C-alpha cells in the first residue's frame, strides 16, 4: 500500500497514464491469484490467508517519513546485510541504509552460479566498456575489487577499466551484486549469494 502511494505521487515516463505497472524492472511484479495458488501448491490457502490478514490488519495505514509515503522497497534475500540506497540508485535515503540481515542456506535460491563463455563475456563487456583490455590470461583481467556496504561488489577493475557490480549483475543476469568471480579458458564464473537489488527489506530476512 505504501509503495503504491509513493508511486502515485510521481509520474513515470514509461507509463504516464498509470501510477504503477507490472514490469518488475520498473514498478511491481504481479501474479494473479489463480497462478499464485498454482505455484504455492498445498500451501496456497495458508499463504492466501496470510496475505489477506496482513491487508486487513493494516487497513488504512501507511508508513510515512516527514509526512510523505516512504519508498517501501524490498527484495528476496540478502547476503548478510542490506545495501545502502545511495550505492545502488545514487540517492541517499535516511531510512534505506545498510543493516544486518542474517540469512542462510535454508533460503531458496540463496546460492547460484553463472558461467559465461569467454567469447560471450568479451562481447558483452566490450559493448559497454570498449576501453577494457581483455588480452592475456583471463585470470589476470580482474583486480581491485571494492566492496559495498553489504560486503558485495561496488566496483571491480576488468581489463584496467572500473566496472560497477550493478552493471555486471545486469550484463550477465546475476541474482545480486554479492559475488566472487573466477576466470579460466573455460569462461568467467560468478558465484552469487542472495537475490535482488539489496535495498530495503529482505523478504526472507524479515520472515
Residue ranges and their predicted role:
Residues 1-207:
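Conserved, single-site charged/polar hotspot
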Amino acid at each position: 500500500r505504501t509503495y503504491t502511494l509513493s508511486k502515485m505521487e510521481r509520474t513515470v515516463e514509461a507509463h504516464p497514464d498509470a501510477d504503477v505497472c507490472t514490469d518488475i524492472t520498473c514498478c511491481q511484479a504481479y501474479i494473479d491469484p489463480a497462478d499464485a495458488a498454482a505455484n504455492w501448491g498445498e500451501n496456497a490457502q495458508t499463504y492466501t490467508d496470510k496475505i489477506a490478514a496482513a491487508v486487513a490488519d493494516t487497513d488504512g495505514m501507511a508508513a510515512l517519513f516527514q509526512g510523505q509515503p516512504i519508498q517501501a522497497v524490498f527484495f528476496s534475500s540478502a547476503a548478510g546485510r542490506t545495501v545502502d540506497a545511495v550505492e545502488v540508485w545514487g540517492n541517499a535515503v535516511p531510512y534505506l541504509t545498510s543493516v544486518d540481515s542474517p540469512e542462510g542456506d535454508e533460503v531458496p535460491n540463496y546460492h547460484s552460479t553463472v558461467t559465461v563463455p569467454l567469447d560471450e563475456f568479451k562481447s558483452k563487456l566490450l559493448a559497454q566498456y570498449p576501453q577494457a583490455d581483455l588480452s592475456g590470461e583471463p585470470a589476470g583481467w580482474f583486480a581491485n575489487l571494492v566492496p559495498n556496504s553489504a560486503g558485495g561488489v561496488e566496483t571491480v577493475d576488468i581489463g584496467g577499466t572500473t566496472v560497477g557490480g550493478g552493471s555486471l549483475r545486469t550484463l550477465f543476469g546475476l541474482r545480486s551484486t554479492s559475488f566472487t568471480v573466477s576466470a579460466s579458458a573455460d569462461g568467467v564464473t560468478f558465484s552469487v549469494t542472495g537475490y535482488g537489488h539489496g535495498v530495503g527489506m529482505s523478504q526472507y530476512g524479515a520472515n
